[in-house]
């Protein structure tokens, strides 16, 4: 399978990855790099647009190469707020040829601004420091629900710092970040009456810090990785439109780890654990609670089989106290060198903390306590293959059951529109196919389509499902015209269900409609380390809305410069 790489042409990058070695993409100037190699600390830019909107069942992709499969045994950092987005299609370059510093800046209509800077400093052979800053935002007029213009503004600024040191037996990692989101709410109309709120503005502050250790000596009888950290989410202007109760502040002490031992060269057993202690201010609708998850597992990695057999045992205190159990099973059979038949049966708990709600929509608000979402089963059956060099395809289908699934719609309250969350049990059948092709560093293309069938037991099912997709289609292509010049083409389509309400002898559709976003772009390196880039999004000039009900920009352009050093 050939890995893909997004170019630095994209208008908005994933802000939490801004500190990584951002100059990896510039290694493409070396024409000898026509092979795919594995790279550490690569920088994967993400498009923060329509692709961020849906939180859907994830279909995991098994490897097709004849080698041991990795099941993400390394810990994830305690992350700041991110959008859900398409997986980056990137080509992996040799890191020792890449620069360690990177700066990019772009500007466009709707007041779009995109600034990223980062540096990776290898202080010594054992010490590494990563620094990153970013600014993403816009300030322009968008179409209001009532077909009027709404003066919208949204700016997100982030700074991150991470440090690692290799001791003889273990590696120490510590780091943290601070993020600020400043924006305004959409009023119910341009001439709305006096509101109980002092202003339409809002300011979210997110902070995090983590420290962790992981083993690096394979001769130890047990391998391990451990991490603990603190996450903070603060809201400056309380959301008091519902019974004068505000969301307040949230603090989370997050601890996780994985300890495992090898039975032989092909087998190992281990246990992962994760604990979250959540604390809320006294004026919050949420109450303090603790969530603990244990994940014992057995793994087999042979020439033909990759098997993981485990279980998720989750306990939670507070109003939703109790124990839940779900499977953690993966079976993948490799035959004829590059064909894989796989079956996954997964599950587990997702905390509906402020960060997850904010990932749905920064315009969110609470009118009730939000229990955690639990997935008793998410089963996927698929077939993946690479019949010829450079071509890869994946056909899959699955079924997902979830308790307290998150749904959302737009609510007019206190003179402004907020994203309102609903919860209920949901059942989702899904199926689709994915095709990828790559030729050296000259051409990459990816096409993926997925059908979804959502069901709930709620009598207002249409209201709950109006923002969920029926069908998703994503296409992306990248081509090198000649050395230094690359062009890009992308398309995203999301089909949603209708939400029709009968009004006397007539009916009215309150659905959000479909998403159709065609984008093009190009980048040109005219000096050794200096490039110019540009992109046009929503080329068809469609009016569509994000899952949380707020309008997206129509045809928008962004251009700028990037420098590697």
Which functions belong to the PLM regions below?
Residues 26-93:
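N-terminal periplasmic/intermembrane-space "pro-region" immediately following the signal or transit peptide
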Residues 117, 159-161, 209-213, 253-259, ...:
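Membrane-embedded beta-strands of outer-membrane beta-barrel proteins
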Residues 98, 103, 306, 314, ...:
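Exposed, low-structure sequence patches enriched in small/polar residues
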Residues 122-143, 268-278, 283-316, 441-453:
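Surface-exposed extracellular loop regions of Gram-negative outer-membrane beta-barrel proteins
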Residues 97, 107-111, 149-155, 199-207, ...:
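Short sequence motifs at beta-strands and strand-loop junctions characteristic
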Residues 83-85, 94-103, 107-145, 151-157:
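Outer-membrane beta-barrel translocator/receptor signature
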Residues 125, 168-169, 218-222, 265-267, ...:
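Short coil turns and loop connectors of transmembrane beta-barrels in diderm outer membranes
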Residues 138-141, 145-158, 172-223, 231-250:
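Flexible loop and strand-edge segments within Gram-negative outer membrane beta-barrel domains
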């Amino acid at each position: 399978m050939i890995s893909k790489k997004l170019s630095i042409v994209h208008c908005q990058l994933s802000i939490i990855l801004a500190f990584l070695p951002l100059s990896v993409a510039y290694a493409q100037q070396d024409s000898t790099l026509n092979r795919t190699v594995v790279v550490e600390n690569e920088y994967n830019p993400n498009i923060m647009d329509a692709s961020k909107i849906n939180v859907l069942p994830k279909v995991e992709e098994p490897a097709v190469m004849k080698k041991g499969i990795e099941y993400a045994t390394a810990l994830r950092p305690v992350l700041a707020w991110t959008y859900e987005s398409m997986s980056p299609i990137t080509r992996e370059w040799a890191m020792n040829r890449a620069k360690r510093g990177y700066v990019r800046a772009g500007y466009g209509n709707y007041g779009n601004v995109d600034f990223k800077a980062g540096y990776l400093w290898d202080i010594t052979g054992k010490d590494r420091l990563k620094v990153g800053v970013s600014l993403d935002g816009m300030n322009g007029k968008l179409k209001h629900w009532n077909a009027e213009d709404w003066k919208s503004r949204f700016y997100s600024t982030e700074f991150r710092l991470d440090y690692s040191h290799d001791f003889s037996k273990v590696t120490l990692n510590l780091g943290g970040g601070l993020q600020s989101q400043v924006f305004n709410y959409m009023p119910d109309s341009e001439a709305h009456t006096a509101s109980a709120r002092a202003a339409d503005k809002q300011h979210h502050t997110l902070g995090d810090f983590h420290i962790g250790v992981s083993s690096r000596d394979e001769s130890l009888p047990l391998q391990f990785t451990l991490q603990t950290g603190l996450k903070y989410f603060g809201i400056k202007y309380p959301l008091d439109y519902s019974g004068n109760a505000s969301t307040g502040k949230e603090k989370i002490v997050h601890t996780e780890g994985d300890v495992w031992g090898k039975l032989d060269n092909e087998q190992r057993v281990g246990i992962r654990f994760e604990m979250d202690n959540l604390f809320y201010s006294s004026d919050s609708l949420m109450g303090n609670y603790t969530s603990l998850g244990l994940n014992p597992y057995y793994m087999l990695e042979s020439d033909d089989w990759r098997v993981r057999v485990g279980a998720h045992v989750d306990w939670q205190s507070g109003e939703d106290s109790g124990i839940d159990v779900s499977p953690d099973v993966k079976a993948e059979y490799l035959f004829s060198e590059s064909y894989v038949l796989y079956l996954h049966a997964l599950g587990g708990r997702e905390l509906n903390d402020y960060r997850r709600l904010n990932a749905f929509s920064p315009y969110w608000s609470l009118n009730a306590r939000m229990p955690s979402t639990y997935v008793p089963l998410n089963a996927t059956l698929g077939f993946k293959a690479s019949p010829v060099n450079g071509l890869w395809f994946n056909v899959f289908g699955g079924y997902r059951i979830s308790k307290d699934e998150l749904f959302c719609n737009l609510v007019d309250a206190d003179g402004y529109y907020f994203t309102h969350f609903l919860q209920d049990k949901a059942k989702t059948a899904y199926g689709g196919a994915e095709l990828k092709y790559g030729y050296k560093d000259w051409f990459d293309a990816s096409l993926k389509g997925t059908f979804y069938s959502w069901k709930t037991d709620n009598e207002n099912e249409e209201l709950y499902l109006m923002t969920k997709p029926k069908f998703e289609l994503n296409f992306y292509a990248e081509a090198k015209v000649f050395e230094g010049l690359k062009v890009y083409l992308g398309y995203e389509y999301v089909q949603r269900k209708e939400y029709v309400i009968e009004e006397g002898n007539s009916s009215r559709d309150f659905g959000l409609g479909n998403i159709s976003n065609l984008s093009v772009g190009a980048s040109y390196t005219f000096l050794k380390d200096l490039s110019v880039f540009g992109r046009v999004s929503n080329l068809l000039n469609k009016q569509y809305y994000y899952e949380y009900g707020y309008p997206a920009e129509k045809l928008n352009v962004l251009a700028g410069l990037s420098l590697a050093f």
